[in-house]
Amino acid sequence: MIELREVSFRWPDEPVVLEKLSLHIRPGEKVVLLGANGCGKSTLLKLMNGLLDPEQGALFWKGEQITRQSMRQEGRTATFRRSCVLLFQHPEAMLFNPTVRDELAYGPRQLGLSDVEARIARWADELALTALLDKPPFLLSGGQKQKLALGCLLALDPELLLLDEPSTSLDPATVGWLVDTLIHSDRTLVIATHNLSLAAELGERCIVLGLQGQILFDGPIRMALSGVSLLESAGLTHRHKHRHGKVAHAHVHAHDWE
């Protein structure tokens, strides 16, 4: 579905964020990104979403190389952005319309979809936003803004959903709904998170990024979360509790990734 080949990226006058990184996400996969703060997880999601172009290397969508310029020139930006969507860690970046209703309607209307009202009703109901439809987004709580931003993306019915720390502002009930909704869908998912419980329940495949922007591990999530399977420098060595009450331990040793 989406592939990065030998991708490198750095911000101006900054050290390399990602270096010669290659990965391939297949249709239907549920992939978790783990790594320390500053290792490039958010940057990687923005590259996959086409918001950034790599300094070196290339991005491929369904076998075809794409860049921001090529999508603009060929008029494919809107189509790609409907198919591959990104939920930012801070949802304020996505919310700019007068009301919650307008936010949910914006994407489908821009794409000329015929069932806009049905999409508004569905996701407002699913995310407990119906009573807030006429409110300005800036009056919502942080958790409500996160739910609204998620609803705006799901209203597009995307093929690939990229989530950057989605549980940061969400209440436990909404996190549970998110798990139940996404795990039973055939939608492709890539999620960057520090929430090990969410990672364990949503992910099938785990990619661990090192501080030098390289892939240290790419394999089954259960292997990554068992025993000596998480990178110590990622700051994830602690007990974590799953939604169903099971407590697990994550102990990490750097040499286990060599």
Residue ranges and their predicted role:
Residues N49:
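Helix-to-loop junction immediately C-terminal to a conserved catalytic motif
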Residues D115-L132:
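Conserved ABC ATPase "signature" region
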Residues P136-L140, Q144:
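Conserved ABC ATPase signature
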Residues L161-D164:
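Catalytic Walker B motif of ABC-type/P-loop ATPase nucleotide-binding domains
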Residues T193-H194:
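H-loop/switch region of ABC-family ATPase nucleotide-binding domains
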Residues G213-L236:
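Conserved beta-strand-loop-alpha-helix hinge in the C-terminal portion
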